[in-house]
Amino acid sequence: MSKYTGTQTEKNLEAAFAGESQARNKYTYFASKAKKEGFEQIAALFLKTADNEKEHAKMWFKELGGIGSTAGNLAAAAAGENFEWTDMYAGFAETAEKEGFPELAAKFRMVAAIEKHHEERYRALLRNVEAQEVFKKSDVKVWECRNCGHIVVGEQAPEICPTCAHPQAYFEICAENY
């Protein structure tokens, strides 16, 4: 709970966060279009402005107390994704159907299925964090340093990468899904 809870200032901060977040996304889309049309400088300026908007959004989000611990952030993200697939997109699909937009309703339902997967992923990651099983598993895994590519086989990632000296935080279970 932030010191702004229940105030008009809280609503203003939420609106500022939403507006800056939307502007950032729009400007990245605009940059892609400008690049495709051959306007490199304009694309770069859209991206620069998008980065500014991202920082503005972060400032307002932090003011609202929106950034917690990783475990808290995973729980909040899972709850948000749950709302999106169980309530928001389900309602949007129903409305689109009623208003004669079956193709859009189908897209809303497809995105809802993706949001469900996002929720499941966040909940699995939260379980790993809470059980202290992010960098240690009960069976042998192949761990890869995300910085230099060093490979380690074992039940846990090393504290420090023996090749590049980056911390354990850079290790992940090697995924070869190709």
Provide a role label for each language-model segment:
Residues 1-178:
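Non-heme di-metal
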